Structures are given as structure tokens and as C-alpha cells.
């Protein structure tokens, strides 16, 4: 017990912390415990009134006055990423509902990571993946967005094999 107190005191001195080592005379409430001493530590405490009188200066950050992107969203590069990822992940796959559900999550994360690797500053990246069974049916997918047509854009790629289809959309929305 004394060894534990000494060790705790040394650690507290090194860290500059406050300890309630003086509470060793507090006995446990129940008779089921054989421990006689109590050791508790606080790694950091702010003394009351210490910082209350000091006003910290506000951090001022200057505006960049940048109203448009320095680098445009590379639609062609993103389109190549979409083609590459969809083809590599789905070329030999057969449609299975549970597998395709997991594949949409995986493919969207891979595409998002690869688009982020292009390091396009100040663009939010949104990736949507649709995978369905190819069974002589039709489907229309539409999207509507409120955005700035001068800076915001998208890239889209559709893929088919013998049993499934996939559509990948990547939206690049400029964030000021």
C-alpha cells in the first residue's frame, strides 16, 4: 500500500498533477473490501479564479477573398476513376442482393478515396452508387441540385455485365 502511494506520488510529481493522496484515512463503506487505503488522482484541474480575470484575445483570421476555385473539378479524371473502379469490382460478379448492397458501400468509399487523392481544394465530394439486376426492365435515375453552375459539376458512368448494371455519380460542389 505504501509502495503504491509512493509510486503514485512520483508519477504525480512528474506530471504536475493534483492528487487526493491525503484521503488514505478514508475507510471503505462495506466490510467486503480488504483495501484500507484509497488513492485517486486528477490529471488536470483548473484553479478557480485563475483564468477568470484574464480575457483572451480573439483570434482573427483574414478572409481569402477567393470567390472561385483555383483548380477546376477534373471531370475527365473522375470519369476515368469511375470506369476503372466499376469495371474492376463488377466485371465478373453475378447479381446477388446482399452482395450488391455491400458492394455499393465498398465501391463508393473506394471512389471517394480515389477522387480525394486528386487533391481538389475546396470541393465537397458526394458519391452515389446504384447497382441493380439486369432483367429486361428499365430504370430512370434523376438528380436535382441547387448549385452554382459555374463551379459545381458532376461526373457519371454506367456499367453493365451479363447479370447486373451499375451507375456511379460523383458530385463536386465548390465550398467557399
Swiss-Prot record:
One of its GO terms (cellular component) is cytoplasm. Disulfide bonds: none annotated. GO terms for molecular function: dynein intermediate chain binding. GO terms for biological process: microtubule-based movement. It comes from the Eukaryota. Gene3D superfamilies: Tctex-1. Signal peptide: none annotated. Belongs to the dynein light chain Tctex-type family. This is Dynein light chain Tctex-type 5-B. It comes from Xenopus laevis.
